[in-house]
C-alpha cells in the first residue's frame, strides 16, 4: 500500500444544494496560462464527457510529453444514463476550468461522476489528501444511539460490498455500492460509496473506512453529508440521490415498540 499525504497549498471550492454536492479541489503547483500544459488540459477536458459515455462510463488517458504531460481519470457511477453521465462530466470539467485556472492537479467528485487530473501519474496510489467533508449542519432529530447503530451497520455493509473485487464487472464498475436502511417508520437512510478502480481492494476498503471515521469526527448527528477524497467518496442522506437507488428495494419499516401490559395482582 503506497500512502501519500500532500502538505501543499490547497484551494477548495464548495457548492451545496438540496440534492447536489460538488467539490472542486485544486492543488500541487501551477502551470503557465496558455502554455503547453494548459492547452493539453483544455483539449482533453473539452472532449471528456463524450469519451466517458463512449467507454461505458469509465475513461482514463494521458496526453502530451514531460514536462507537460497530463494524466486523467473519469467515470460515472454504474447504471447512470448516458445523458446524465455526460451532463455530470461536462459540469465537472467546466467547474475545474473555472475553479482551477492554472493548477496542475485537480479533482471533482459530484454525486454520479468524478474527474481527476494531474501532471504526475497517480494510478494505484493511495493519496488520501486533500479531503473535505460536506454536510448539512441541521441536527438529525432522532435518538443518536439508535441512529449510530443503524448508520454504522449500513455503512459497514455498503463498504464491504463496494470493496470486493468484482471480476465479472467492467473495470469502471468496480468498488461501488449503494444501500438503504430503515431509520424510523417514515425515514430511510440512503448511502453510496465508491473508489476509483485503479486501486486495490484493500486500499479501497482502507480509504472508505478511514473516510467514515473522519466524517463522524466532524459531522456526527447532522442530516446528510459527504466526504470526498482523491480516490474514494462516501455520501448519505435521508432521500434518494444521484439516481443510485432506482433498482434498490426499500426495506420494511422497523416494527413498532411493543408495550408490556401491566401485571394484575
Swiss-Prot record:
UniProt-listed CDD domains: Gnk2-like
Primary location recorded for the protein, binned into one broad class: secreted
Positions annotated as glycosylated: 34, 102, 119, 247
Top-level taxonomic group: Eukaryota
Keyword Mitochondrion tagged: no
Keywords: Glycoprotein, Receptor, Repeat, Secreted, Signal
Signal peptide stretch: 1-23
GO-annotated cellular components: extracellular region
Compartments where found: Secreted
Matching Gene3D superfamilies: Gnk2 domain, C-X8-C-X2-C motif
Protein family: Belongs to the protein kinase superfamily. Ser/Thr protein kinase family. CRK subfamily.
Record-given protein name: Putative cysteine-rich receptor-like protein kinase At4g11521
Naturally occurring in which organism (per UniProt): Arabidopsis thaliana (Mouse-ear cress)
Amino acid at each position: 500500500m503506497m500512502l501519500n499525504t500532500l502538505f501543499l497549498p490547497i484551494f477548495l471550492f464548495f457548492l451545496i444544494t438540496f440534492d447536489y454536492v460538488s467539490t472542486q479541489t485544486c492543488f500541487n503547483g501551477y502551470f503557465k496560462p496558455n502554455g503547453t500544459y494548459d492547452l493539453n488540459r483544455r483539449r482533453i477536458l473539452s472532449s471528456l464527457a463524450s469519451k466517458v459515455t463512449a467507454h461505458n462510463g469509465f475513461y482514463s488517458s494521458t496526453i502530451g510529453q514531460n514536462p507537460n504531460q497530463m494524466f486523467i481519470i473519469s467515470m460515472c457511477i454504474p447504471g447512470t444514463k448516458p445523458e446524465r453521465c455526460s451532463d455530470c462530466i461536462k459540469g465537472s470539467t467546466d467547474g475545474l476550468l473555472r475553479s482551477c485556472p492554472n493548477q496542475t492537479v485537480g479533482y471533482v467528485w459530484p454525486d454520479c461522476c468524478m474527474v481527476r487530473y494531474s501532471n504526475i501519474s497517480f494510478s494505484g496510489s493511495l493519496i488520501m489528501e486533500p479531503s473535505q467533508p460536506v454536510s448539512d449542519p441541521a441536527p438529525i432529530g432522532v435518538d443518536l444511539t439508535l441512529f449510530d447503530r443503524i448508520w454504522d451497520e449500513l455503512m459497514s455493509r455498503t463498504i464491504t460490498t463496494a470493496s470486493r473485487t468484482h471480476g465479472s464487472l467492467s473495470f469502471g464498475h468496480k468498488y461501488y455500492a449503494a444501500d438503504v436502511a430503515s431509520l424510523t417508520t417514515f425515514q430511510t437512510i440512503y448511502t453510496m460509496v465508491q473508489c476509483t478502480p485503479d486501486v486495490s481492494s484493500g486500499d479501497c476498503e482502507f480509504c472508505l473506512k478511514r473516510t467514515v471515521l473522519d466524517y463522524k469526527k466532524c459531522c456526527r448527528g447532522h442530516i446528510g453529508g459527504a466526504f470526498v477524497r482523491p480516490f474514494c467518496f462516501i455520501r448519505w442522506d435521508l432521500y434518494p440521490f444521484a439516481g443510485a437507488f432506482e433498482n434498490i428495494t426499500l426495506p420494511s419499516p422497523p416494527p413498532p415498540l411493543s408495550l408490556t401490559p401491566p401485571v394484575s395482582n
